[in-house]
From Swiss-Prot:
Family the entry assigns: Belongs to the YbaB/EbfC family.
Record key words, sorted: Cytoplasm, DNA-binding
PANTHER family, sorted: NUCLEOID-ASSOCIATED PROTEIN YBAB (PTHR33449:SF1)
UniProt GO cellular component terms: bacterial nucleoid; cytosol
Cross-referenced Gene3D superfamilies: Nucleoid-associated protein YbaB-like domain
Functional summary from the UniProt entry: Binds to DNA and alters its conformation. May be involved in regulation of gene expression, nucleoid organization and DNA protection.
Listed Pfam families: YbaB_DNA_bd
Source species of the chain: Chlorobaculum parvum (strain DSM 263 / NCIMB 8327) (Chlorobium vibrioforme subsp. thiosulfatophilum)
InterPro entries with a match to the protein in the record: YbaB-like_sf (IPR036894), YbaB/EbfC (IPR004401)
S-S bridge residues: none
Name this protein carries in UniProt: Nucleoid-associated protein Cpar_0834
Binding partners and assembly: Homodimer.
Compartmental location: Cytoplasm, Nucleoid
One Gene Ontology term of the molecular function aspect: DNA binding
Lineage summary: Bacteria, Pseudomonadati, Chlorobiota, Chlorobiia, Chlorobiales
Length: 111
C-alpha cells in the first residue's frame, strides 16, 4: 500500500485556503436584493450576509406593523438570494471538494 504524499496534501490544502480567501473577498462585492410589498421595502445584502441598504417608501410609514412585516420579508428574501449566490461561488472555487453549507457556517452565513 502506497503512503500518501503529505507534502502534496499540504500544498493542496494551502491552495484551497487561498481560493477560499479569494472567494470571501468576492462575496463582499456581490450584492443581492430582496423586496416586499410590491417594492415598497427593498433590502440589499452582500455575499457575506451583511445588510448594506434598506429603503422604505415614505408613504407606508404610518402603518408600523406593515412596515415591520415588509422589512422582515425583504431582508429575508435578500439573505436567501445572497446565501444561494455564496453557495454557488464556493462550489465553483472548491471544485466539489468542500461542502459549501459547512463553509458558510464557518464564515457566519446561514449555510
Amino acid at each position: 500500500m502506497a503512503m500518501p504524499n503529505f507534502g502534496d496534501m499540504m500544498k493542496q490544502l494551502q491552495e484551497a485556503g487561498a481560493k477560499m480567501q479569494d472567494v470571501q473577498k468576492q462575496l463582499e462585492k456581490l450584492v443581492s436584493e430582496g423586496e416586499a410589498g410590491g417594492g415598497m421595502v427593498k433590502a440589499k445584502v452582500n455575499g457575506r450576509q451583511k445588510l448594506l441598504e434598506l429603503s422604505i417608501d415614505p408613504e407606508i410609514m404610518d402603518d408600523v406593523d406593515m412596515v415591520q412585516d415588509l422589512v422582515v420579508a425583504a431582508v429575508n428574501k435578500a439573505l436567501d438570494a445572497s446565501a444561494q449566490l455564496a453557495q454557488n461561488e464556493i462550489q465553483k472555487a472548491a471544485g466539489g471538494m468542500i461542502n459549501p453549507a459547512d463553509l458558510l457556517k464557518q464564515f457566519g452565513g446561514q449555510g
